[in-house]
Regions:
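Histidine-anchored nucleotide/phosphate-binding helix
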Residues: 46, 139-142, 315-317
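Catalytic metal-binding/acid-base residues of hydrolase active sites
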Residues: 41, 61-63, 115-117, 156-158, ...
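Zn-dependent metallo-beta-lactamase
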Residues: 19-57, 61-76, 218-226
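Active-site metal-binding motif and surrounding structural segment of the metallo-beta-lactamase
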Residues: 51-56, 62-152, 290-308, 321-325
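Long, structured stretches of catalytic cores involved in phosphate-ester chemistry, encompassing
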Residues: 284-380
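Sec-dependent signal peptide recognition
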Residues: 2-8
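Hydrophobic h-region of N-terminal signal peptides that target proteins for export
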Residues: 9-18
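Flexible, acidic/histidine-containing loops and adjacent segments that form or flank the divalent-metal
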Residues: 21-34, 40, 92-95, 101-108, ...
Length: 417
């Protein structure tokens, strides 16, 4: 109880670092890059407003019925449980899209990989809708709240990694629910694409690309393949010496990319793993190490696999050398103490949780691992026009006013290497 009290006090003290009168984030303006790590308490979602106003969403998680956890294992749904995660995500996107002064839609939406906390859960919370061949949950729900011009995932159109049979067995009914949305989009002539490993053109700016030539998203890994670092060239993550039948699991099949704007750079790697069983010698499950060889340094990184024990191995942390790390977390087990030890050892000074249970914060505080952890909430990385400076804001995820509860110093972006 004492640890929990101290952790809560630490959060309250951090809140007071911002002016006593709550302030809202200044509206997006042309030339600014905003990256919103949305906290719902029920899964991962990242919303990007790119410098010309192009909009990208990565994931729309929904863990479904929370009753299978104890109250201490998972944080409350935020801002509350009155709406589904997809409805709260849609409201957030609508709110922060107002400065664009145009129709509400997403130019791109991508599912990093096929796990419930990234694209929905098929249980009693999934919504049956008359006339629809699929239930609404996560991305299938969001796609019916906000039009998506191009929907991207790791497997379209064949969904056959590691094999078609293994893919379907692994992902089951939840995938087939999503696949009905895919077929509906195809019938309507709406764009579907596979994440193109090696490409830096897939997420092109849609409104005024010529004005921002330094902006690009480099697709690094996904669906069993990885960029070599040369042109659009790719190779299999699993080398030729691996035993026959060796394959990545769903997490390590995640889509991975590097975003650049001016001198600023940012890493997103889904749930790829950085560890493997030495007893089984299944070394190919460590995707972080090969990624570390081509990714380059960044200013801000999203922790892979929510900061779990297999997240952010030493090779990747050293290669990224990030100033700040964002943690998409919501339960007692993420981030894991071993991961926080590695992050602290690397010298990362600011760690931003998009959600956090008070119990886990207390545990990490008690172990001396929470010094770099900032208040939890919606985490917004704002990159100023031209990409030379950036600042990180924490917005209140319990409020529909999205007040600023913490703000970092203004960082100087370090340049792309």
């Amino acid at each position: 109880m004492k640890r929990l009290f101290l952790a809560i006090v630490a959060v309250i003290v951090a809140f007071t670092a911002v002016d006593a009168k709550p302030k809202q984030l200044k509206p997006w303006s042309k030339g600014t890059l905003d990256i919103h790590h949305i906290s719902t308490g029920r899964g991962s979602t990242i919303f990007y407003i790119l410098p010309d106003g192009t909009r990208l969403l990565v994931d729309a998680g929904d863990l479904g019925d929370p009753s299978r956890w104890t109250h201490k294992e998972i944080m409350p749904a935020v801002p509350n449980g009155d709406k589904t995660p997809a409805e709260w995500i849609a409201r957030y996107i609508e709110h922060f899209s107002k400065p664009l002064d145009k129709e509400l839609y997403l130019d791109y939406a991508m599912i990093s990989h096929f796990d419930a906390d990234h694209y929905g859960k098929l249980d009693k919370t999934a919504i049956t809708v008359e006339g629809k061949p699929y239930k609404y949950t996560g991305m299938t729900h969001l796609a019916n709240l906000i039009p998506i011009h191009t929907l991207i995932d790791r497997g379209y159109p064949n969904y056959d990694y590691p094999t078609a049979e293994a893919f379907r067995k692994r992902n089951g009914k939840l995938f087939f629910n999503y696949y009905e949305l895919v077929k509906e989009r195809e019938a309507k002539g709406l764009k579907m694409e596979q994440f193109k490993v090696g490409s830096d053109k897939q997420f092109a700016l849609k409104s005024d690309a010529a004005a921002y030539p330094s902006f690009r998203i480099q697709n690094v890994a996904g669906n069993g393949n990885i960029w070599t670092g040369k042109g659009n060239e790719t190779r299999s993550v699993i080398g030729p010496k691996a035993p026959q039948g060796a394959a990545l699991n769903e997490n390590s099949s995640s889509c991975v990319f590097r975003l650049e704007y001016g001198n600023f750079s940012y890493y997103m790697g889904g749930d790829i793993s950085g560890f493997y069983s030495k007893k089984k010698n299944n070394y190919w499950l460590d995707v972080q190490t090969p990624v570390s060889k081509v990714i380059g340094t960044v200013d801000v990184a999203v922790a892979d696999h929510h900061g779990y024990r297999d997240s952010m191995n030493d090779a990747l942390l050293k290669a990224l050398n990030a100033n700040a790390i964002v943690l998409p977390v919501w339960d007692l087990y993420h981030p894991h103490p071993s991961t926080m030890k590695r992050i602290n050892k690397q010298g990362v000074t600011e760690v931003f949780p998009a959600g956090m249970t008070a119990e886990n914060l207390a545990k990490l505080t008690d172990q001396g691992l929470a010094d770099a952890i900032r208040p939890a909430g919606h985490i917004v990385v704002r990159v100023l026009n031209g990409g030379k400076k950036y600042q990180i804001f924490v917005l209140n995820d319990r409020s529909l006013d999205y007040e600023i509860i913490y703000k970092s110093k203004v960082f100087t972006a370090r340049g792309n290497k």
